[in-house]
């Protein structure tokens, strides 16, 4: 049995095959995901698993150089935004790098999300609890 954090085979495979600047979207239960997009659906019930727990698990195995958020999160869901930014600060300390943070309109976020290597759907039922993680290199 795998010893490290992520036990989900699909998610572990996607992370292992990501290269520099590849994107991985972690989203709430409501983000539209095109049929042709590689979707790793972790949603079990409302809130399970939650967005931040999935982000923390993914960040334990993925070196992150940049994140993209929908700018609407600032006004509509500032609680999740602040919690997410705290997690990003913790990741920066662990990785010993600065993670670039970019805010874009939600419609543009959906377009960029469609370009990601995969979308990880959580059970989060909180508006704009979505992030695109861009892979960096740990050297």
Curated annotation (Swiss-Prot):
Pathway(s) of this molecule: Carbohydrate metabolism; D-ribose degradation; D-ribose 5-phosphate from beta-D-ribopyranose: step 1/2
Q: What Gene Ontology terms for biological process does this UniProt record contain? A: D-ribose catabolic process
Pfam families cross-referenced by the UniProt entry: RbsD_FucU (PF05025)
Subunit details: Homodecamer.
Q: Which family would the database say this protein is a member of?
A: Belongs to the RbsD / FucU family. RbsD subfamily.
The record, for HAMAP family, names: D_rib_pyranase (MF_01661)
Q: Provide the protein name.
A: D-ribose pyranase
Species of provenance: Glaesserella parasuis serovar 5 (strain SH0165)
Higher taxonomy = Bacteria, Pseudomonadati, Pseudomonadota, Gammaproteobacteria, Pasteurellales
